[in-house]
Each structure stands twice: as C-alpha cells, then as structure tokens.
C-alpha cells in the first residue's frame, strides 16, 4: 500500500520576499517583485528588468569560505533548505537512519554565474586562473549535494534539470520516493539564478522575454491577450516532505498533504506549445 506524504516545512527566496507569510501577503495583494535590474549594467540590453532577489546576503547564511564555494543558485537552495528544515522542526542528527533522508533539488540551468565568471578568467588571464571549484559549483546537482553534506544525509541525492518544470518534477520525484518506501524524509524544491548578462541576453534573443521596459511591474501577464513574453527571475522554493506516520510520531505540524503527481510531454517542440 502506498504511504501518505505530507509537507512539514517550506520556504521561499524570491524578489517579492524571502519569508513565506510576507511573500504570500504581497502576492495576494497583487504586488510585483519585478523591477529594473541592478546587479549589472543592462542599459544596452533589449530587456533591462526582471525578478531580482535584491535583499539576499550570503553572509547571513554562510561563512565567507563556504559562500565562495557555492554558486548563487546553490546559495539560494541551501538558505531555503535551512529555513524549511527549521520550520519542520526535524533534527536530522537524531534520525535513526540517515539513509532514509535525502534531497532532490531542480534547476533548469544551474551555475550560470560561475560559468560566466570563469569564462572571463579563461580568456582574460589564461587557463591557469580558472577556479578549481568551477565544476562542483556549476553542476546542476551542486544544490542537492551541498544540502546533503550540510546535514550529513546519506539517502537519495539527485537533481532534476527539466526547464521550467524542474522544481515541480523534483517535488514529484521526492514524493514518490517516500510513497514507495525508499525514504522517510526528503528536502526538495527548486532553485534558479539565471539573471546574468548571458542568461538575460540568451532568453531575450530567443524572443521569450517581455520587452515592456517602461512598465516592468506589469510585464508579466501570461493570460493576457497582449502578452509579449515572460519575465526572467531568480530565487528558490524548498519544502520538507515526510512520511505521514513519521511526522505524526515526532509531533510535527502538518502543513499540507501531497496526494498525487503526474507527468506528460507534448512531444512537439522544445519551447513552443503544441499548436
């Protein structure tokens, strides 16, 4: 018999706020986190706005050495995981079997910031100046791996790279691992940090982004007749999934229950919906 799966912790790192109640209140009030980008000069770009996380300070979550070994997308993911685990109240050190606790984090692109930084070093200063941490920072599974290491979890640890569906896909996979008795607790969700010169110009060249530079706050309008593209943003969303009886035994507050999950593909085009 399939086991029940519940949510016992959740967190967000977004342009609209990095606290779940604050984020939800602003969302319900119709507020936008989209504004002109500030991390780099994009005055010559076709698009100069996005959903930028402007209040995130790595030093609030990691020491200097640790932060330098994490790409921005992994920083978002680990910071989000810390908050979600804190809300769940779970003590991984007290769990009897660390092989029953795991992580799946989705990311469509991974460490794009690191790729751009090291690419510049390669051509400006030569191959000997490329960081030895480049590969472990840019890998899509860097977020999951670093979360596993942080809590010394020895259960399933993997990543999902499935474009815009990466986080939902990751949560669904984690749900199934618990449902089918492979794990008892999973940290799961998604993280993205593709607001970089290359990321912004690449999506703009695809014709995928809205170009409403004069009204960025109202540019995201996916169901509007006059929509002209999506808005590039960054951030993370992380939840703690837990087997129902496991959560009940430790007296955890149950926030929600995951009842099912499915996947499909139109098999038509990489970016356009099936006409």
What are these regions (language model features)?
Residues 167:
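Short conserved active-site loop signatures built around small residues
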Residues 170:
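Active-site histidine-anchored catalytic micro-motif
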Residues 7, 22, 28-162, 191-200:
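Conserved beta-ketoacyl condensing-enzyme motif
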Residues 10-17:
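Short polar catalytic/cofactor-binding loops
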Residues 182-186:
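Short, high-confidence coil segments that cap the C-terminus of an alpha-helix
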Residues 42-52, 110-114, 193-220, 262-275:
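Active-site-adjacent elements of ketosynthase-type condensing enzymes
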Residues 4-8, 35, 214-275:
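Condensing-enzyme catalytic core mediating Claisen C-C bond formation in acyl metabolism
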